Amino acid sequence: EPFGGAATCIGGAIRDPLSGRSYVYQAMRISGAGDITAPISETRAGKLPQQVISKTAAHGYSSYGNQIGLATTYVREYFHPGFVAKRMELGAVVGAAPKGNVVREKPEAGDVIILLGGKTGRDGVGGATGSSKVQTVESVETAGAEVQKGNAIEERKIQRLFRNGAVTRLIKKSNDFGAGGVCVAIGELADGLEIDLNKVPLKYQGLNGTEIAISESQERMAVVVRPEDVDAFVAECNKENIDAVVVATVTEKPNLVMHWNGETIVDLERRFLDTNGVRVVVDAKVVDKDVKLPEERTTSVETLEADTLAVLSDLNHASQKGLQTIFDCSVGRSTVNHPLGGRYQLTPTEASVQKLPVQHGVTHT
């Protein structure tokens, strides 16, 4: 599902620095596709056409970035037959925060974990493993639910909340919800945890304990705070219209415990979890070690004209202005270099350059 997949790319990239209390203000997108000019009739069975994937993914990424107010100042798509089997969707971001707003402390027994942001649904169940497993002709019909459904406005509210130093200084430790859902986002915060899955806000009824625990629904954060700071933190969340609920406590016993409908459905020792499961060792054979990079070209006097025409007719050398213009590159008033420059505003910029974001006054940094 290209739209949701690309939106998840940028949404997840924003939440990673956000868990460190950083405000993301700068983004770039580099993607890879097959031949987008190929006839749709030549599309491989069970695959979406390359032009559909390319366009839909671009709109998914730009839609999320534009709504959340993130300047994307470098956008480039590369074309190569290898991207037909596995598309590339790369989102890179830069974030910053005042040093005094960042507190990193070890959780202690009695501390509580607050889940804030979006609600939990079945979207994204199995997403982390789904992106790596073998795809078949049925995948396009059966695997769509593995892609999370993003909500940029919800994440924008969390960004606003985390720019408030009075709020972030209450946080001892933070994690964003990504692969593995509650199991990972909350499970990584402390050695001993007791999680009540019935307290996790749901998008709709009918989810079982396993689905609640592993759902990768977006726009969710988990934070560790002291018991005496819960009311103040939740009150600040309410000011930004963000749902915030206490769902877990830190325990002395180093076990990850989950309760659902009055039953204990998970009880694992931390020392077992820290082994990271079974280690797999496989033998690999590199079959194309001598492959040449697409841009490694040679020419001669005799073939110069033909080689020049080959370069100019390559999709990788076509103007990407149409793609770049759907991304907001100036929101936030920190942009130094726009994606296109030069006398005719057609020359691609080779770097993403922006000033640091400040809430008051003007900066030249």
Please describe what each predicted stretch is.
Residues E1-T365:
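Glycine/proline-enriched, intrinsically flexible loops and inter-domain linkers
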